[in-house]
Swiss-Prot record:
Catalytic activity: beta-D-fructose 1,6-bisphosphate + H2O = beta-D-fructose 6-phosphate + phosphate; D-sedoheptulose 1,7-bisphosphate + H2O = D-sedoheptulose 7-phosphate + phosphate
Keyword Nuclease carried by entry: no
Binding site for Mn(2+) 1: 33, 57
Described function: Catalyzes the hydrolysis of fructose 1,6-bisphosphate (Fru 1,6-P2) and sedoheptulose 1,7-bisphosphate (Sed 1,7-P2) to fructose 6-phosphate and sedoheptulose 7-phosphate, respectively.
Protein name: D-fructose 1,6-bisphosphatase class 2/sedoheptulose 1,7-bisphosphatase
Family: Belongs to the FBPase class 2 family.
Binding site for substrate: 88-90, 119, 164-166, 186-188
Lineage top rank: taxon: Bacteria
Gene Ontology biological-process annotations: fructose 1,6-bisphosphate metabolic process; gluconeogenesis; glycerol metabolic process; reductive pentose-phosphate cycle
GO CC terms, sorted: cytosol
EC number: 3.1.3.11, 3.1.3.37
Species name: Prochlorococcus marinus (strain MIT 9313)
Length: 334
């Protein structure tokens, strides 16, 4: 991987974001996702690389494009593995709510954990708390550690939690410490990454979300030097989701074993979920969010706001791009 490839990866998420943004607020989440998938795959196909999707839209028989194992790119050049979520927060996009984005993680071949389509308990925190907070500890313990690491009173901390029934006890425990809870309906990738930047007002992500998105979050947090841990959730009683209504704990363990995951209780560090020598995170806002603005359509241009984080040169680049339309007469400065 090199800087030219990183620039092209940025353009991949920009094009996906623009495609979804045309459907923002129309209540068409599936169509918005499909548009992002098509745009992402098209741009990937123009890159000189031997790309492979390791986390995507589903298994080959479940998804027409960007399925797990699909080869993308020109077929020549460096081998690159991708974990993609072309429209993270499809409901947010459909309802024109904050936090939807096109996002991916990339690494050298074999550098990303091929997470199963399971749930994952997650803990994300700032670099100053790395290795000090721990997913094995209670929320109360971790909040007190965060307070010490950040030099903030517990009452000044904001903890992001997915607004799900399974988190009722977690939310109660957090509030009992005096810390503030920020519930979100979808899109925990952006919330996790926001923990890695000072000034976002987001200090920690706790709770259970999707495992594939956990790998993307881990890639970003590894590159930022932030804290991220994940642990697969296989017990339907803990996940508390209608999607697993017909699943059993024993059946889920068997599924994981079939995938080669024998230590089903393993706690994964960011460096294990994104283990490659070169790791890149790229995200582009579809709607406004914690880290960047959404796509803005203007008469003569389209504006995107994006973030690329890379271990290649240890940088986090916030990029505002003006995509000039044919025949443009006047481009406003901002």
């Amino acid at each position: 991987m090199d800087r030219t490839l990183i620039q092209e990866i940025l353009e991949v998420v920009e094009q996906a974001a623009i495609a979804s943004a045309h459907l923002t607020g129309l209540g068409k989440k599936d169509e918005a996702d499909a548009a992002a998938v098509e745009a992402m795959r098209k741009r990937m196909g123009q890159i000189q690389m031997q790309g492979r999707i390791v986390i995507g839209e589903g298994e080959r028989d479940e998804a027409p494009m960007l399925y797990i194992g699909e080869e993308v790119g020109s077929g020549s050049g460096p081998g690159v593995d991708f974990a993609v979520d072309p429209c993270e927060g499809t409901n947010l996009c459909a309802n024109n709510q904050r936090g939807s984005m096109a996002v991916l993680a990339a690494s050298d071949r074999g550098g990303l954990f091929n997470a199963p389509d399971f749930y994952m308990k997650k803990l994300a925190a700032p670099p100053s708390a790395k290795g000090k907070v721990d997913i094995r500890k209670s929320a109360t313990e971790n909040i007190n550690i965060l307070s010490q690491c950040l030099g903030l009173a517990v009452s000044e901390l904001t903890i992001v939690v997915m607004d799900r029934a399974r988190h009722k006890g977690l939310i109660s425990e957090i509030r009992a410490t005096g810390a503030r809870v920020q519930p979100i309906s979808d899109g925990d990738v952006q919330a996790a990454i926001a923990c890695g930047f000072a000034g976002t007002g987001t200090h920690c992500l706790m709770g259970i979300g999707a495992a594939p998105e956990g790998v993307i979050s881990a890639a970003a947090m590894r590159a930022l030097g932030g804290h991220f841990q994940g642990q697969l959730v296989y017990d339907p009683a803990i996940a508390q989701t209608s999607e697993w209504a017909d699943y059993t704990k024993e059946g889920n363990i068997a599924r994981l074993n079939e995938m080669g995951i024998t230590d089903v209780d393993k706690i994964y560090e960011a460096e294990e979920l994104a283990s490659g020598k070169n790791v890149v995170f790229a995200g582009s806002g579809i709607t406004d969010g914690l880290l960047f603005h959404g796509v803005k359509f203007e008469p003569d241009c389209t504006r995107t706001s994006s973030l690329v984080i890379s271990t290649l040169d240890n940088t986090a680049r916030f990029t505002n791009t003006v995509h000039i339309k044919d025949g443009a007469k006047s481009i406003a400065l901002s």
